[in-house]
């Protein structure tokens, strides 16, 4: 608010959770927000382009800007081909994953989510253009690991200690906020007015698909696969609260 731009680093933290939550806080305050996170000195899950062993984290990147849209104009994605959670979800559902997401312990492409054990996620761009995801993930390590003093690589005896880099930019320091918000909304509509490609239902602005899903789940509830539900039930029973939560 005072100096128009601010940045900070965080390290030796636990899991950051939903990374977009922090840029969205900035957007609601009339600022552009950005957040980057790495996996600290914890075990890695992503093989750099051209390699078969994990040396990078999924290192997500999130940004959000103020707008007059119904939903937030934002992005939040891993710099790997896919977030690790989607691999675990496919395994829990007994489903295969698309080819190009993971490699097994021998560096071979696999569609079996269980192959991630001893294998690795591929970087954003997959086997063909993964150098792009590798570059983004490596920059994430610099901002969240080296700039913070946390370091890089794996410390086997260390605790979970992720790093973060966050920045907020006051829009009013550059342009009137109301004008900026209007222009972002008009830009989003300009994108949505793009003639759809064959087989496409149309273009969505960044963050729109999550906004649609949030409204739907708010009205209809959140779908949870059986394997996860059983785990939750077991934890509730272990804690003596299964009946109170409706598991019994």
Feature-to-residue mapping (PLM):
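Glycine-rich beta-alpha junction loops
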Residues: 40, 79-82, 171-173
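Secondary-shell segments that build the walls of catalytic and ion/ligand-binding clefts
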Residues: 92-154
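Catalytic-core signal marking the mid-to-C-terminal active-site face
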Residues: 142, 153-248
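Conserved active-site and cofactor/substrate-binding residues in soluble primary-metabolism enzymes
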Residues: 17, 21, 58, 119, ...
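Glycine-rich phosphate/pyrophosphate-binding loops
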Residues: 31-45, 141-158
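A glycine-rich, acidic short-motif signal
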Residues: 1-61, 65-71
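Short glycine-rich or small-residue beta-strand-to-loop segments that form or flank ligand, phosphate
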Residues: 6-11, 123-125, 166-172
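Phosphate/diphosphate-binding glycine-rich loops and adjacent basic-rich segments that engage nucleotide
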Residues: 44-114
């Amino acid at each position: 608010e005072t100096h128009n731009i601010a940045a900070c680093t965080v390290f030796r933290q636990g899991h950051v959770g939903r990374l977009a939550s922090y840029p969205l806080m900035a957007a609601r305050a009339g600022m552009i927000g950005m957040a980057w996170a790495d996996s600290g000195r914890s075990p890695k899950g992503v093989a750099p382009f051209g390699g078969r062993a994990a040396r990078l984290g999924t290192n997500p990147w999130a940004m959000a800007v103020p707008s007059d849209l119904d939903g937030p104009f934002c992005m939040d994605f891993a710099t790997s081909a896919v977030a690790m959670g989607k691999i675990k979800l496919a395994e829990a559902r007994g489903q295969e994953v698309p080819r190009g997401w993971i490699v097994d312990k021998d560096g071979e492409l696999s569609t079996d989510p269980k192959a991630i054990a001893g294998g690795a996620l591929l970087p954003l761009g997959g086997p063909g253009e993964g150098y792009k995801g590798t570059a983004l993930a490596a920059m994430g390590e610099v901002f969240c690991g080296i700039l913070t003093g946390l370091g890089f690589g794996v410390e086997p005896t260390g605790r979970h200690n992720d790093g973060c880099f966050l920045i907020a930019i006051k829009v009013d320091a550059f342009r009137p906020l109301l004008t900026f918000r209007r222009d972002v909304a008009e830009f989003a509509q300009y994108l949505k007015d793009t003639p759809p490609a064959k087989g496409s239902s149309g273009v969505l602005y960044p963050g729109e698909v999550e906004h649609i899903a949030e409204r739907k789940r708010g009205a209809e509830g959140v779908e949870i696969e059986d394997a996860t539900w059983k785990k939750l039930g077991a934890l509730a029973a272990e804690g003596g609260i299964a009946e109170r939560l409706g598991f019994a």
